[in-house]
Amino acid sequence: MTTRAHIDGVVASGFNDVRTEFERNFAERGDIGAAVAAYWRGEKVVDLWGGRRTPEGDQPWNKDTMVVVNSTTKGLAAMTLAVANARGWLDYDAPVARYWPEFAQNGKAAITVRQLLDHEAGLVLLDEKLTIEKLRDLDAVARVLARQTPAWTPGTRHGYHTMTLGLYMQEIVRHVDPAHRTLGRFFHDEIATPLGLEFYIGLPRDIPGERLATLKTLSAARGLLALRYTPPAVTLKMITPGSLLRRSFAGLAADPNDRRYLEVEVPAGNGVGTARAMARAYSAFAEGGAELGITPETFARVTAPPEVARPRDEVLGVPSYFSLGFLRPGPNVSFGSSPRALGAPGAGGSFAFADPDARLGYAYVMNKLDFYLEDDPREKALRDAVYRAIARHRPERRHSISQSTAPLRSAGISVART
């Protein structure tokens, strides 16, 4: 007999379908523990959590349960650079070496911040493996990064910088911040604290382990079986030992359930927090970023549709669209109501994004890893339910994933306990 998963939280009136799909994720789609949150027009309209925080046992996923979100961290890291740009500390079109002279080694002198954040720099590999011990020494990590040679001529193509992007963003922040804070500290001080977020890039040691969800990772057998969900080109890259995709993971191998790994800063992949926190952060962006000191000029830069001359991703083997550190909508990754949407997915199924035209901030997190490159059925069911609810509040402007919509007008929404 299957035990029904506990579900708790709140939804606004009109958003009950999100709760229904959340329940179906446990009953039909295999979720173990998860949470979903959405803010619309600056107000919380969905905040649900449920299931178990560990794959085995009966410890419940509670309101304050946090989980590592893998590459969904990249979007939060990119927000820190947007704040730096708004403050005049960072020019996206300047060479990285202007701020970090040592970066210019081995053919990298002309690489701009934009090229790096757009995954065009060719810095997808690490010639030296970074252990947890080395990751604690950021100066040592910086020397490794500075010595790296690009895998292709920078600016001529693009490819997903799986684990390295966050490490390079770390060094940019450390060099442009007048206080030389780490990216994790900068995020905490300038984004998390002002917004009241429980999200960390570098987990504090005083966070009790009982608050952390444990990931159910893929075994080798399940991993091979799960490849049927990925595009054939990506599958080929994953099973080819010498591919850039396979090699991109070799420089930084860590167990996402290892507390030591969570306590160092890996801004491309080890952020820990709640869906509520990420949805709130993206809501601030969806509202224009004023809460974070984002200027209209920076907001326009960050939300401008990406210019991708060659959509094929050299690492993934399929088209991808990135701009200034964020994933953007494309033919094979459709989210948001217009090309201005921005966010970041994470390995296993987590996803968070901002939709400025709909004024929506959204996030989904879970502890059971699946292997969809995009549109994990669990997450997409929730996302679609959110947009259906928004459309019902404004029937004459129904949402279409592939069609831009105008900003939605204010609607009175009362929050009801469920």
Task: Spell out what each predicted region is.
Residues 1-15, 318, 324:
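Short, compositionally biased leader-like segments
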Residues 6-69, 91:
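Short, conserved catalytic-motif segment at the N-terminal edge
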Residues 42-43, 68-89, 116, 161-191, ...:
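Alpha-helical scaffold elements that line and support the substrate/ligand-binding pocket
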Residues 44-48, 352-353, 359-368:
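Short, well-ordered beta-strand elements
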Residues 62, 148-155, 166-170, 258-267:
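Flexible glycine/proline-enriched surface loops and loop-helix/loop-strand junctions
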Residues 63, 68-72, 86-128, 146-147, ...:
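Active-site helix/loop module of the DD-peptidase/beta-lactamase fold
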Residues 217-275, 304-357, 393-397, 402:
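Active-site Gly/Thr loop motif
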Residues 266, 287-290, 303-311, 372-418:
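Short, gly/Ser/Thr-rich active-site loops of penicillin-recognizing serine hydrolases
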